[in-house]
């Protein structure tokens, strides 16, 4: 054992790690492309359909990405324990590569109709299934090649792959956007990152074809000790099912919520809450991933010295203790004006108790129609802190009080015919009240066609506009078709019109809250994001070795894959939507952090009390 620990890595071992890691990076790259490019995919495949149909498609696509992964773990885990590690994760990479490449070629709904979103969802399901089988295969394969005393170090290279896949997807998207420009990228350029996956697929398959079967699996098959029913043995026998449950709740759930908080939720927080420009946020996250990724290998190596459990539990504890101050530091660095407003401005929503719902919206397509939900959804989208007081009378609309101003909300169902006008009026009044109380809102310019100018001036008395003076000033004449396509006029309003003057009125359009680029502290943000990534590396770096060491060879692929993908696909994958819903329910942009903190705490307690230390186990003697 001492010799194995001190001997340098052989050429064969390097090839095993490189081949396994490269293929897994490729699969994560493919998986993350969908999330990063969701807005363009939605516009191409879903936007032509009625809202209900669009919502069903979006929900199915979401479910296919995250919720299908455990089923992939069952299918390919069983296959890996029956026929071998090498051939199983060769199949997973072929499935992932094929499904990703075809997304880049798939015609949109405008060309092939409803077949487009249906095929897209089927391809996304294939991606989820393949990813469900890939990780367990790669981790098991590498661990079974690793010498005793180096499994943490060897498998830590696999742990870098999810982060490197995310990093690679962000870099490729940014480069293609830079080369093509935003318009061309939105129209067709978003397909290029999917098509480029063919290159990675070819290299990965070529390398994996040259690999040999895992020595532990080959020895087990030679001795006739393989499992004939891995699923039944892994989850139908209590002694093994108990290990799977302990792996899930004593390790993986906490790892998953810290992983998603440190990478996905941090990115969402920057763009969705702090309103930092999306491209800038992607660059900052990419920088933090680049700075932090080496710690996966460091903590994997360290776990061979001091154990898997102390490092994972320390990462969970640090995350629990520091998430609130770290995310508050992100606010002060990313949007100082918002941070100051959060300390001085607080709205009060008064509504009937039955009017306020929990706003769980994983697909981003749900519509909130009660007056309370409309008010709280608007405030949450604009990162406005608020309290909900459920003392309103039944049947009366909710009100929003900001300073000494009270604004009435509306019920979208009861006011169906007028809901668009009521929504515009509610948002405008609320924004004016927020701005008057010092909230950092910016009002964009408004483009107003001549036929609507008088009504616009009358509807915005706070601007002190003069219609005659505007008509006498600068104007642009637009053809009727452009007025309709630009949504300045409806088709009915443009009937019989050849062209019309359009006036651009400064600071008279929609209100927005955007982080001022001049005040965004890049270095501070990258520093905080890097700390969050280091927490990720602490909980994630040693976990592959831990999971491999918990299960015997005969059911290892199956046994470790299912808890890993339930934890990461369900508990982790649902984190952004659940955290946002929690923040919306409490009117506090930080309240959603209780989701990862509570689950990390549960894992910490269970892990400390019941999870065994596994670093000294001989995985070849467990059968």
Predicted feature residues:
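Extracytoplasmic gate region of multi-pass secondary transporters
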Residues: 34-35, 240-288, 327, 354-389, ...
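Extracellular/periplasmic helix-loop-helix junction of adjacent transmembrane segments
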Residues: 38-71
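C-terminal ends and interior cores of transmembrane alpha-helices
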Residues: 47, 94-113, 318-337, 510-517
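Cytoplasmic membrane-interface "Motif A"-like loop-to-helix N-cap segments
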Residues: 82-94, 305-316
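Glycine-rich segments within core transmembrane alpha-helices of 12-TM secondary carriers
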Residues: 130, 152-177, 200, 326, ...
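Helix-loop-helix hairpin linking two adjacent transmembrane segments in secondary transporters
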Residues: 162-208
């Amino acid at each position: 054992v001492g010799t194995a620990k001190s001997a340098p890595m052989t050429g064969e071992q390097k090839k095993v790690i490189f081949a396994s890691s490269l293929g897994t990076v490729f699969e994560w790259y493919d998986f993350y492309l969908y999330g990063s490019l969701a807005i363009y995919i939605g516009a191409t495949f879903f936007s032509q359909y009625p809202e209900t149909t669009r919502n069903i498609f979006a929900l199915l696509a979401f479910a296919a990405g995250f919720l299908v992964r455990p089923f992939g773990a069952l299918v390919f885990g069983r296959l890996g324990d029956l026929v071998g590690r090498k051939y199983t994760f060769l199949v997973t990479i072929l499935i992932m590569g094929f499904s990703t490449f075809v997304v880049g070629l798939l015609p949109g709904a405008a060309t092939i109709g409803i077949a487009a979103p249906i095929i897209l969802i089927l391809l996304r399901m294939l991606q989820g299934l393949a990813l469900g089988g890939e990780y367990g295969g790669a981790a098991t394969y590498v661990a079974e090649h690793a010498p005793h005393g180096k499994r943490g170090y060897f498998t830590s290279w696999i742990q870098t792959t999810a982060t490197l896949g995310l990093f690679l997807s962000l870099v490729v998207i940014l480069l293609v956007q830079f080369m093509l420009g935003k318009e061309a990228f939105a129209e067709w350029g978003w397909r290029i990152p999917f098509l480029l996956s063919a290159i990675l697929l070819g290299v990965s398959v070529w390398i994996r074809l040259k690999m040999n079967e895992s020595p532990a699996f080959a020895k087990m098959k030679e001795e006739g000790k393989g499992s004939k029913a891995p699923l039944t043995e892994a989850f139908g026998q209590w002694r093994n099912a108990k290990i799977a449950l302990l792996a899930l709740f004593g390790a993986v759930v906490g790892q998953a919520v810290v992983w998603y908080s440190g990478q996905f939720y941090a990115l969402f927080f920057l763009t969705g809450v702090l309103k930092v420009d999306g491209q800038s946020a992607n660059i900052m996250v990419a920088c933090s991933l680049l700075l932090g990724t080496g710690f996966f290998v460091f903590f994997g190596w360290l776990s061979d010295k001091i154990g898997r459990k102390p490092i994972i539990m320390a990462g969970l504890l640090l995350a629990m203790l520091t998430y609130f101050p770290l995310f508050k530091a992100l606010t002060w660095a990313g949007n100082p004006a918002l941070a100051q407003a959060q300390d001085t401005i607080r709205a009060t929503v008064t509504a009937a108790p039955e009017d306020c719902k929990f706003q769980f919206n994983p697909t981003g397509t749900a519509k909130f129609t009660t007056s309370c939900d409309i008010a709280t959804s608007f405030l949450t989208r604009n990162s406005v802190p608020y309290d909900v007081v459920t003392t309103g009378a039944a049947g009366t609309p909710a009100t929003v009080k900001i300073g000494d101003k009270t604004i009435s909300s509306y019920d979208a169902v009861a006011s169906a015919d007028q809901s668009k006008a009521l929504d515009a009026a509610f948002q405008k009044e609320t924004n004016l009240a927020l701005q008057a109380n010092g909230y950092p809102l910016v009002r964009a310019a408004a483009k107003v066609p001549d036929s609507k100018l008088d009504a616009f001036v009358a509807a915005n008395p706070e601007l002190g506009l003069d219609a005659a003076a505007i008509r006498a000033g600068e104007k642009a004449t637009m053809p009727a078709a452009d007025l309709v396509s630009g949504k300045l006029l409806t088709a009915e309003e443009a009937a019989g019109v050849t062209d019309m003057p359009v006036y651009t009125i400064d600071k008279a359009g929609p209100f927005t809250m955007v982080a001022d680029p001049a005040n965004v502290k890049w270095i501070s943000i990258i520093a905080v994001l890097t700390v969050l990534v280091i927490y990720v590396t602490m909980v994630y770096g040693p976990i592959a070795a831990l999971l491999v060491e918990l299960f015997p060879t005969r059911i290892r692929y199956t046994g470790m894959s299912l808890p890993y993908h339930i934890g990461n696909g369900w508990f982790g994958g649902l984190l952004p939507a659940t955290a946002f819903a929690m923040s919306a329910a409490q009117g506090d942009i930080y309240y959603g952090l209780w989701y990862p903190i509570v689950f990390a705490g549960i894992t910490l307690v269970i892990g400390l009390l019941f999870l065994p230390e596994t670093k000294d186990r001989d995985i070849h003697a467990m059968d």
